[in-house]
Amino acid sequence: MLREILHDKNGNEYIVEGVMGFGRYTVCVNWEFWSVVDNKKEFDEEVEQIKRLHFAD
């Protein structure tokens, strides 16, 4: 399992998890489906995208 914990400027916590199944990672944000990726590099790219979308000033 891959996990990244993010906090926004209001102190809200966002848990981003990648759970392995059938050779791929299902990416969830606070236990809600986000996407499916093939490896840790793609997971890290998804985390960066989540930061851009949800933490933009």
Where are the predicted features?
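Short intrinsically disordered terminal tails
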Residues: 1-2, 52-57
